Each structure stands twice: as structure tokens, then as C-alpha cells.
């Protein structure tokens, strides 16, 4: 969950988000080192009046600044590709949930169960209870079992939407006429909040997402009561 004046990413709750956080730190360190080197060179150029004429057209340094950026890009690309393939892998999901975006709410269908579907609207600010989060609470939460791979099938009924839950490392576009999929897996129970992350009209800001991750036995009891 995000909090005011937060500088870093939200706490990772899924293996994918842990990998994304590690990749972010890895890339940020490379960018920091490059920026430090560039600033150092600029400061030298501004503070010295000496010129080394033999290095103005040296083949050696041209070779170095051609090979070195290629190595740096490979160091960034390989972990990035690894995370991308991990995000795309869905092996033997325990549950499949179909998510449809609408202007301006979400609808969910548990395809492994008969007649288990509902719409999820934002709770009006006048109806909030003490402790509720403004513009993030919904009337029907998506209840899912924790520590199990869950496949989300995501599409849209009207315009482009995007189903995103930052703490789980999820952001998948909901495109009319196309079915995208994502993997949901939580390592701990709790409430995880997200929002539509694609501008989709005047009420784009009023499409929150709330996932309630619970142990399997509680999920089975919830699904039986629906």
C-alpha cells in the first residue's frame, strides 16, 4: 500500500514484484554510475584549459566507447528479458478469473464456478466507513486464494482500460476484442489496491481495484456463500 511522501516502490507481495524491484535497483545503479562518470568528465572539461591533442581522433578510445555501451545495454537487457518471460509464464493455474473493463467499473467472472460473477463499483465518498480509503474502496472485492497461481483474463467492453495492482507487479491492458492474460500470486494475505491505469474517459479516476487475498479455506467458504 502506498503512503504519503513515499519515494520508493510499494512493498512487494508477489514473486514478480520482487523481481521487478530487484531489476529496478539493478538498472538504477547502472544509471547512477553512468551519470556520475558523465558529470565528472563535464567538470573536468569545465575546470581545465589543457587539451590532449593525441586523443582527439584516437582509434582506441573510439573502440572503447563503442564496446562499453553495448556491454552496459546487455547487462540491462538480460535481466529485463528474464522478468518479461516470468511475467508471461502461466503454468497450471489453480483458478481463472475473467476481468472486463467498462466505463467506469470492473466486472469479474470466476470461470471455474457456475454463476459466480459480479460487478465492482467504487464506493461513494459519502458512504465510506471510518478507516476506508477515499477513491479506492469498492462494493465488491475480488477474493482470491493466496500462494496459488491465478490466471487473470483481461478485456474490455468499450474503450481501452488497464488493470493494475502495483504491489503485485500487475499492469495489463484491457483492449476491446482482445483477451490478455496475467498471473496473480500473493505471498501473504491482505487487501491490495489498484486503479485503472489507462485514461478512459471522464470518470477514469473512479475505477478502483481491490484484491482480497485469503487462505484457501477462507476462499472456499466465500465461494460457497456466493
From Swiss-Prot:
One GO term describing the cellular component: mitochondrial inner membrane
Gene, per the UniProt record: MT-CO2
EC number: 7.1.1.9
Mitochondrial intermembrane-facing ranges: 1-14, 88-226
A Pfam family the protein falls into: COX2
Catalytic activity: 4 Fe(II)-[cytochrome c] + O2 + 8 H(+)(in) = 4 Fe(III)-[cytochrome c] + 2 H2O + 4 H(+)(out)
Name the UniProt record assigns to this protein: Cytochrome c oxidase subunit 2
SUPFAM superfamilies: Cupredoxins, Cytochrome c oxidase subunit II-like, transmembrane region
Taxon lineage: Eukaryota, Metazoa, Chordata, Craniata, Vertebrata
Keywords: Copper, Electron transport, Magnesium, Membrane, Metal-binding, Mitochondrion, Mitochondrion inner membrane, Phosphoprotein, Respiratory chain, Translocase, Transmembrane, Transmembrane helix, Transport
Topological domain ranges for the Mitochondrial matrix compartment: 46-59
Subunit note: Component of the cytochrome c oxidase (complex IV, CIV), a multisubunit enzyme composed of 14 subunits. The complex is composed of a catalytic core of 3 subunits MT-CO1, MT-CO2 and MT-CO3, encoded in the mitochondrial DNA, and 11 supernumerary subunits COX4I, COX5A, COX5B, COX6A, COX6B, COX6C, COX7A, COX7B, COX7C, COX8 and NDUFA4, which are encoded in the nuclear genome.
Cofactor(s), names only, from the UniProt record: Cu cation
GO biological process, alphabetically ordered: ATP synthesis coupled electron transport
UniProt organism field: Perognathus flavus
Cofactor annotation remark: Binds a dinuclear copper A center per subunit.
Membrane topology type: Multi-pass membrane protein
InterPro entries on file: CcO_II (IPR045187), CcO_II-like_C (IPR002429), CcO_II_C (IPR034210), Copper_CuA (IPR001505), Cupredoxin (IPR008972), Cyt_c_oxidase_su2 (IPR014222), Cyt_c_oxidase_su2_TM_dom (IPR011759), Cyt_c_oxidase_su2_TM_sf (IPR036257)
Family: Belongs to the cytochrome c oxidase subunit 2 family.
EC class (word): translocase
Function as written in the Swiss-Prot or TrEMBL entry: Component of the cytochrome c oxidase, the last enzyme in the mitochondrial electron transport chain which drives oxidative phosphorylation. The respiratory chain contains 3 multisubunit complexes succinate dehydrogenase (complex II, CII), ubiquinol-cytochrome c oxidoreductase (cytochrome b-c1 complex, complex III, CIII) and cytochrome c oxidase (complex IV, CIV), that cooperate to transfer electrons derived from NADH and succinate to molecular oxygen, creating an electrochemical gradient over the inner membrane that drives transmembrane transport and the ATP synthase.
This protein's record includes keyword Cytoplasm: no
Binding site for Cu cation A2: 196, 198, 200, 204
Ligand binding (Cu cation A1): 161, 196, 200, 207
Database matches in CDD domains: CcO_II_C
Phosphotyrosine modifications at: 218
Listed PROSITE patterns: COX2, COX2_CUA, COX2_TM
